[in-house]
Each structure stands twice: as C-alpha cells, then as structure tokens.
C-alpha cells in the first residue's frame, strides 16, 4: 500500500479465431438488488530535482500480513471440486466481430437478467473500487487499499517513504460489498487492475482468489520503468501479488490473463454493457523511455449501455509527476472516448487531471470523484455551480455512511442512488465574482 494514493485514499466459453476472442458466461444466480486523507501518489508532488513483467514474474515471498503466496495452497484444496466443475462447464464458441467498423477483440458474457449498474464504492480515504453489473454478470475495476505491506526483508520490496502501514486497508469492506450485491465465484466475468498503485490494486489478489474472474486485465509494470524514485512506493510488491494470483487463476480454473491490448480495440460485452478498454499510452512508450508515474501506464474503461455512456478514468493525468509538465494524455484519451454522460474523474479529482479542454470534450452531466472536495480544483466541477452537473465526492459521501453511489442504466437514461445525506461545499476562486456552492 502507499500513503500518497492510499488514503487521499458459468459457465465460460473461450476461443480465439482470426484475432477475435469470445467468452460467454451465464450466471448461476441473478444479482441481488443494490440498495482523511492520507497521501501516497496523490500528495502534492515533491521537487523532483531534490529527490534522489509480464505474467512470468516471480511471486513475492511472504512479508508482514500478506504476500502473493498466502492462501494459495488452502485455496487450491478448498476449491478443487469447484474448479473441476468449472472446467466441466466450459464450452468454446467463436464469432467474427466488428465494433464501429473496426476489427476488435471482444469478450462476451451475455448473462441472463438483472439491472445494469455501475457501483462506485466509498473507501477509506481516496481509492478506486468500482463494480459493474448487467444481466446478473459482474466485473470489478480495481479494489482499493488492502491489508498488508512489504516489511523490507526482501530486497525486491524495500521499505520506502510514503507506503501505507500494513494494518490499513479496505479488504473486508470491498469483498463484503461484492458479496452483498450478488458477486460469486461463478459470475465475475472480469477483473481490471488499472495500474500498479496500491489504492487501486492492493486487493486484486484477494478479489481474484475469492471471486475467480474469468478474464484478468492489467497492464504490465516494472519498477525499472519509473524514472522518479519518489514514485516507487510498494508498486512492485502489490503488482507481483496480483500477478501471482492471476497465475494461480490460470492454473486452477483456466482464467485468461491479458496484459497487452491493441490500441482501443478491446471490448467486453457484459450483459447489456459494452466495456471498452482505454490504455493511456497505447504504444507503451514507457517501456523504452521510462515514465515518472505508474498512473501514466494505466488503462481506463468506457462503458456504453442503452445509448448512455460513462468513462472510468482511473488515474489519468495530463501532467508528469510534477503536476506541471503537460503530456497531452487527456487530449489523446478525449479523442478516443468522446462525449459521455458520467465521468469517474481522473486521479481522484486532483489538480494533475481533468483540465478544462478534457472536461469540455467529455461534457459529462455527472461527475463521481473518488476523493474529497477539499482538494478539488475549480475546473473539475465548474458546471456544478450553474446547476448543470451532478457531483459526488466519495470521501464526503462515505463520511455520511453511504456505501456507494450507484448509476443505473436503462432505456429511460441513467438514474443515481440517493446520497442526499452527504453534505459539502466548494469555493470557486476562479469565478468572478467569487462563488460558493453548498450541497
């Protein structure tokens, strides 16, 4: 875990033909109805002038509370019967698919029945944990901070400033929420780990081992690609834990582990949802030139359903780690994404992200921020003061005891769950005259 990010915190069928991979999943049961800030990579950046793999990566050794191998033997033993059943139920299918006139790699999980929803979970501090559901099949994007941290005994995972203590984390909260809302080990279609920061994928291994996603997506990561030493934290440790769990999933029940995508041409048909993966650096230039922050290696997701859309922007930044030097990522992503109805703000709504041209291009009518109003720049929510946009900063929503904000997609549009018990305000210093807005 890392402090700057942490607390700002079946039936399955798979086949590959002509570059098209198609998977199908039918759930065993329909989904149940939905009813502080500490800092790691989200801290104000330090003056950098003053600062000093793939699926074959080795599993980390045990350290402190959790390591990649924890629970593997127990999971193998307790789940062996279920794995055999899953293997018996797997059936292969294939079809040629085109999305928008472009050949695409499409994973299909048709489901049976049930609502189409995006759940953005409240977390401790600022972190991303987003549950998708449609027709009784589910997907999980990220999973917030987990319990455990490297203890420094393994030279691959040294103790570093800014790593969240091992006792802090939302493991029980996230796993419990998923179970409560109907996720089982037979109906989780895919897991997407957007990038190797602990406030996003620290619980990836727990989610994979408990809920057995049929496809696991996550970009490759290595500490050697990070040029800013202050941006390393426990990235490699949490990434290696996820990779070890993904390898276990491949061996145990035949999961697919996908770490490379072809531009913006990877889609998942999840019930009535189309989920399009949006890599921030499609050419993976960081593998050659390096990059200052793992955020810049990330993958976002555009969701379309019933003629409405959402962009889940992970930690998309338009700057390098200094939060000053612009990199053009938002312009490139905006061209790929286009206008959306709902935006999960990039990088928790911090000032490295969501610049005016990006907000104008996406033009969302709802902004969900996995962070706090207290550090929100005016540009993220400028339209809120004119009454044109719904805004939910999840730190304030969570402080009101609300477990999530749920967006329900239907032929009538998008409706949002009630979070009126939460309250906050914002001062718009860039407005003339100065403006205040209160909820």
Where are these regions (language model features)?
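Core dinuclear metal-dependent hydrolase active-site scaffold
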Residues: 95-187, 259-342, 406-439
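Asp/Glu-rich intrinsically disordered low-complexity tracts
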Residues: 38, 42, 47, 54-56, ...
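Metallo-beta-lactamase
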Residues: 187-199, 343-347
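Bacterial N-terminal signal peptides
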Residues: 13-24
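Sec-dependent signal peptide cleavage junction
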Residues: 26-37
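N-terminal secretory signal peptides that target proteins for export/translocation
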Residues: 1-8
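Active-site HxH/HxHxD metal-binding segment of metal-dependent hydrolases
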Residues: 189-190, 198-248, 364, 370-372
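Long, structured stretches of catalytic cores involved in phosphate-ester chemistry, encompassing
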Residues: 322, 328-405
């Amino acid at each position: 875990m890392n402090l700057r990010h942490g607390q700002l915190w079946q039936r399955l069928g798979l086949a590959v033909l002509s570059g098209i991979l198609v998977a199908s999943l039918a759930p065993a049961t329909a989904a149940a109805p939905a009813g502080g800030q500490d800092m790691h990579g989200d801290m104000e950046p330090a003056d950098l002038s003053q600062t000093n793999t793939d699926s074959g990566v080795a599993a980390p050794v045990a350290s402190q509370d959790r390591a990649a191998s924890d629970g593997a033997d127990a999971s193998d033993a307790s789940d062996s019967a279920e794995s055999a059943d899953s293997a018996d139920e797997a059936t292969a299918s294939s079809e040629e698919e085109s999305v928008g006139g472009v050949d695409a790699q499409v994973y299909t999980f048709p489901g049976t029945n049930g609502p189409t929803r995006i759940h953005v979970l409240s977390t401790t501090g600022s972190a991303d944990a987003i549950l998708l559901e449609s027709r009784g099949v589910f997907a999980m994007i990220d999973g917030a901070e987990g319990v455990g941290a490297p203890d420094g005994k393994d030279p691959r995972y040294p103790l570093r400033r800014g790593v969240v203590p091992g006792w802090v984390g939302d493991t029980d909260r996230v796993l419990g929420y998923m179970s409560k809302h109907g996720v089982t080990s037979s109906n989780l279609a895919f897991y997407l780990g957007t990038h190797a920061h602990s406030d996003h994928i620290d619980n990836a291994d727990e989610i994979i081992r408990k809920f057995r996603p049929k496809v696991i997506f996550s970009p490759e990561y290595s500490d050697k690609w990070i040029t800013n030493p202050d941006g390393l934290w426990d990235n490699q440790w949490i990434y290696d834990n996820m990779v070890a769990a993904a390898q276990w999933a491949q061996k145990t029940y035949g999961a697919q582990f996908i770490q490379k995508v072809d531009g913006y041409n990877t889609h998942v048909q999840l019930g009535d949802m189309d989920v399009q993966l949006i890599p921030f650096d499609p050419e993976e230039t960081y593998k050659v030139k390096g990059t200052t922050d793992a955020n810049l290696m990330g993958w976002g997701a555009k969701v379309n359903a019933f003629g409405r859309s959402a962009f889940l922007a992970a930690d998309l930044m338009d700057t390098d780690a200094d939060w000053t030097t612009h990199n053009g990522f938002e312009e490139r992503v905006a061209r790929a994404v286009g206008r959306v109805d709902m935006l999960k703000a990039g990088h928790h709504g911090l000032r490295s992200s969501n610049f005016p041209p990006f907000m104008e291009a996406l033009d969302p009518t709802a902004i969900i921020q996995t962070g706090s109003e207290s550090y929100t720049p005016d540009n993220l929510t400028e339209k809120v003061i004119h009454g044109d946009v719904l805004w939910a900063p999840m730190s304030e929503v969570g402080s009101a005891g609300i477990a999530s904000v749920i967006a329900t997609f239907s032929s009538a549009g998008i409706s949002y769950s009630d979070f009126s018990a939460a309250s906050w305000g914002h001062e718009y210093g860039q407005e003339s005259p100065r403006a205040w807005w209160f909820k």
